[in-house]
Amino acid sequence: VYAACDKEYFKEHAPSLVYSLNDIGKDIHIHICDPDASVHNIEAVLKKDIDVQLTCSYNDIGATPIDARAYYSCLRFMMTPNILPSANEMLIVDVDCVFMNDFEWPTTDTGYFPRQPLEGTVGWEADGTRVAAGCVYLTAKAMNVANAINERIKEGPMRWFIDQIALSEVFARVDEKDITKFDGNFMDWEFVDDTVIWTGKGPRKYENQKYLAAKKSFNRLGLAADNLWRKSVE
């Protein structure tokens, strides 16, 4: 499982995601933009406290992008071509999601979450809401798809929804037989108990008490020191 974020989002959200994946036995890679010392400290503690493998990569943002919010939303897809060759397969997710249940890997080489455009939207926004970007699946055999998504994002414009527009346009050219289509039974933002991924969309990530309670219950970073001490004396 793979996600990307800036340093502040890592501190706020990554521990819950990592522990939720640890509970279902799935390895995770997180790409972090502009990490600082506290990010590396959290990363080191997580690696020692979990049973699955956590790997991280990094980049410096350099000049501030025209639309930083859009840049960070696209970061995971822009870095995918660098990371995918070393992974047999990856599920690309939001760093602020949590895994509530285990899942089986798709049998196709690609997967995404198509949906109807958001009611009342037109033009760019309507095109951008045809895809939920919170779960995209690629195997190493789908490098052409990973590269195409990255290239479309680079074409721009770098504004909100460009990642979803890139996904929509690229997956429209992929053979249907090579695609697994995810739906609300796999990922949802209404926080239904038997779905795999809960993701916090918009204000829900700060206001929905069910989602916040799940995030809090997964985040065992505060218990890590005691846990690591117990492991050392056993």
Language model region names:
Residues 34-39, 95-101, 185-187:
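Short, polar loop motifs at secondary-structure junctions
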Residues 1-62, 85-86, 223-230, 234:
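N-terminal anchoring/stem segment of glycosyltransferases
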Residues 79, 135-137, 197:
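Conserved hydrophobic/aromatic beta-strand scaffold that supports enzyme active sites
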Residues 100-169:
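Conserved catalytic core of nucleotide-sugar-dependent glycosyltransferases
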